[in-house]
Amino acid sequence: MGKVAVGLSGGVDSSVTAGILHRQGYTVEGVTLWLMKGKGQCCSEGMVDAADICEQLGIPHHIVDSRDLFQKYIVDYVVSGYEVGVTPLPCSQCNRMVKFGPMLQWAKAELGIDQIATGHYARIRYNDQTGRYELLRAVDRHKDQSYFLYDLTQEMLAGTLFPLGEMTKGETRQIAAEMQLSTAKKPESQDLCLIEAHGSMKTFLDKYIEQREGEIVDLDGKVLGHHTGIHHYTIGQRKGLGIAAPEPLYVVKLDNVMNRVVVSTRDRAGQSECTVQRMNWLALPGITSPIRAEVQVRYRSGAVPVTVIPLEGDRLKLVFEEPQFGITPGQAAVLYDGDRVLGGGIIEHPEAA
C-alpha cells in the first residue's frame, strides 16, 4: 500500500487514523509536532499518548521540534492581530504554515515518505476535468473541519490523506474501541491549544499585550463604560461587557486608533458586504468576473448565499443576500459550492474597502 507519515496529536481521531491505515497495509510512521515552548497539555500529555499509540500499533514514533515555527506563525501572529483589534484564525494558519507544509517536507527529507495523513474531518478528491485537487466537507457535518483547511495548497492536498472524512465521530469512537486503542475514551479537546496551555485566551494575551484602558461607546459615540484593553474583546461578543443596558449589546467594532470598543444592539449590527484578502483558491484557479456561491464566515456558522466580486490582486468583495451579524476582521471567509470548497481568505477591516 505504500508508506505514510501520520500526524499524531495524542487524541482519538489521529490514533484511529494511524490504526486504520496500519490495518489497511500501509507502512505507517507516527509524527508528533512539538509546538509550544514551556509546559502545556498539548505538548506533554499529547506526546505521551501519541507514543503509547505507536507502541500499541508497533510503529515508529518521531517527535519534530516545531516550536520556532509555532512561535513565529501562531503566537506572534495571534498577538499582533489582537493588538490592532483583529481576531485572528490561528488554526488555518497553523495547518498551512506549521503542520501540513512542514510535515510533508520533513517526512520526505527524513523518512523518504511523500504522503501524510491526519485525523481531520474533511475529504480530498482529484478532479480529472480541471486537473485540480478539491477539498470537500466531511460526511459528518457537525465535525466538518474544511473551514480550517481552506488555506492548504494544491501540493499539500495532493500529498494528504483524510481517512476520517467519510466517517462520523461515533464511528471513529467505535473503531477505537474495537482496536482497543488507549485513547478510545479520551475526552475531546474543546479549546485552542493556546487556551488549553494557558487557561484562557485572556491569560495568554495578557502575557504579551499591555492592558490599556479605554472607552466602550455606542454607535453614536456615547460613552457607556470602560475596558482594560481591546484585545479582551471580539466582534459579536455579548457577555462580559460590564454594561447595564435595557437591551442586549454586542461588540460591533474594535477601534485601535481611538482605543475604543464600539457596541450596538443586534438589529443595528448587520453588514451587507465585506472585503477579503489573501485569497487562496482551491477548486478554481481564480475568477475574473462575479460568481454566486455560499460563504461561511465563522466555524460554527452556516454557509449563506453571496455574490463574489473579484478585486485587484488576491482580494474579493463579498455581497451578502441578507445582512450578516458578527463579520469579524481576521477570521476566514470560506467559499463553498455545495460540499466543495472553492477557496477562502481573511476578512478585512471595513476601512480597507
UniProtKB/Swiss-Prot annotation:
Main localisation? cytoplasm
E.C. number(s) listed in UniProt: 2.8.1.13
| Localization annotation | Cytoplasm
Tell me the superkingdom of the source.
Bacteria
Task: Recall the GO molecular function terms of this protein's record.
Answer: ATP binding; tRNA binding; tRNA-uridine 2-sulfurtransferase activity
The catalysed reaction is:
S-sulfanyl-L-cysteinyl-[protein] + uridine(34) in tRNA + AH2 + ATP = 2-thiouridine(34) in tRNA + L-cysteinyl-[protein] + A + AMP + diphosphate + H(+)
Catalytic site: 94 (nucleophile), 193 (cysteine persulfide intermediate)
Which cysteine pairs are joined by S-S bonds? 94-193
Q: Does the keyword RNA-binding apply?
A: yes
Site note Interaction with tRNA, residues:
120, 331
Gene Ontology CC: one annotated term: cytoplasm
Q: Which residues are listed for ATP binding in this entry?
A: 7-14, 33, 119
- Pfam families assigned: tRNA_Me_trans, tRNA_Me_trans_C, tRNA_Me_trans_M
Q: Which GO terms describe its biological process?
A: tRNA wobble position uridine thiolation
Q: Which UniProt keywords apply?
A: ATP-binding, Cytoplasm, Disulfide bond, Nucleotide-binding, RNA-binding, Transferase, tRNA processing, tRNA-binding
UniProt keyword Protease present: no
Annotated region described as Interaction with tRNA, given as residue ranges: 143-145, 298-299
Region forming the signal peptide: none
Job of this protein: Catalyzes the 2-thiolation of uridine at the wobble position (U34) of tRNA, leading to the formation of s(2)U34.
Family designation = Belongs to the MnmA/TRMU family.
Against HAMAP family, the record matches this protein to:
tRNA_thiouridyl_MnmA
Q: Which named protein is this?
A: tRNA-specific 2-thiouridylase MnmA
Starting at the broadest rank, the lineage of the source organism is: Bacteria, Bacillati, Cyanobacteriota, Cyanophyceae, Oscillatoriophycideae
